[in-house]
């Protein structure tokens, strides 16, 4: 045997090692049970991978992001094996890892029910206990088709190998398919029993755990219907979702987070707190705000409008529809056509519901000659836009078909662009802090160089724009995560990702550098420079919340419906102990309303404790309770949402407490 030299990177330390020919990756990590795979020369590999001379090797721990994906992918295989044991006629779709879990799609005659999931879990535990080995083997297209002749969906994937498998498919479906086939060699994974028999096989690129025994904790979560490859024209399959974690404690923590997320679900709270609804008569993805929800929306919009003015923006307004040709000029047609509603025939001419505001803002800029002295020129509006979202992705307020976008466009010189992007990023982060979100990271979306037909503009323009955004992000000191291929067709973007009270991440602001729409081929925007020459501005798109509706949904869940006083629909619930105290509290309410505070008096026939309970259920920040002694003293019992109560508080003091809490924009 000859010696091989490899480099092992572990815990930020690099070690040169000499090993013998035939050494497998697992031999480097025998003393570390947390390692379940290896990254060899940048590519994820099974621990059974044979090393070569010069390899750069890194361990992959089960609790790392890559480790989670491998664990969940392997668990998906075990689940599919169990399903085919219990339901021999089930045909396999795809089974990739996803955020916090995995799924597998099956073609079965009857949808799975909860009892089926229990049986599948039991069968999975037996497979895990057996310690079946995941074994990779390379095959040819012809051999794979022969071996998998009873699996029509797998054969279809083999036919799509290397083609991208994307025609008519959702992004999730494309990514799921890529787990099974890709542009490289075709592989099958066998689950092998200890006696050497093959228990089950699946078309897959891997990598996988060494054995099924390395699955510490899992749970099947739910079932759903899903179209094959995410295309509504294809057959509807049955999908089983599950989750897997590196320990039972980690699984329990995840399940607790799910319970907490369900408790905070904005759709349920919106109904319970009478904030908004989704009437079938109007249509899917088109929310209606009730009076209390309307208060939150108005307060948010008023504050955001005020802050934009303070930051140098000018408020504008544009219509909901426009001639179709406008969107060809901007490039949204054809690049963004699938997300737009079909054309409307108006007097023999095609119009479109707008899906974005930027083309109309460009027309405002172009409406007269502009001077360099006017730049940066910042335009802003709450523009109502409409997106043709598929019904399967619509979700409460966070994914809708019609929404108000807090949309702004800055027109700047190339030299002003870095400072303007920094200004916009600081503005966005400050707004989120005002609304109680203060845990962020940034994501930089760039173009996919392998798909030039999906992007417009020169390589040089893209390089300059990307560098400007990247420099500003790095200077912010926030974590920066790359998102290759995620850019808009007209330029790169940075998005602010905010974590809520239970650690979930939400994409919030987007800031996009656009060198295309101002160009002569598009809107031909220009300004007169100091030397009298005609120059093209850079256009910077920015949506602070992306969607007012979506941000309200996020805040409902972040606060679990218990809004800080400045946002609460009702800031004070006045509770008379008896009917004779009603007039006193109505006078108190008028006094507070004159100061702009939102007060309601509960003059129902309910007993006082029931009134307090009702106010707690509505998550009202403050209660003012009055009886005979309070009326005589010109005071109230001042009660907080958390149950604390101060008795005999003079009216002036009670009102000041509320006003100060509202002005501070802090939670109580």
UniProtKB/Swiss-Prot annotation:
The record's free-text note on cofactor binding: Binds 1 zinc ion per subunit.
Tell me its cofactors. Zn(2+)
Q: Which SUPFAM superfamilies match?
A: Class II aaRS ABD-related, Class II aaRS and biotin synthetases, ThrRS/AlaRS common domain
Indicate the segments forming the TGS domain, all copies. Answer: 1-61
Any one of the GO BP annotations: threonyl-tRNA aminoacylation
According to the UniProt entry, the coiled-coil residues are none
Recorded GO CC terms? cytoplasm
Q: Which domain of life is it from?
A: Bacteria
Q: Which family does it belong to?
A: Belongs to the class-II aminoacyl-tRNA synthetase family.
Q: What is this protein called?
A: Threonine--tRNA ligase
Origin organism of this chain? Nocardioides sp. (strain ATCC BAA-499 / JS614)
Q: Which gene encodes it?
A: thrS
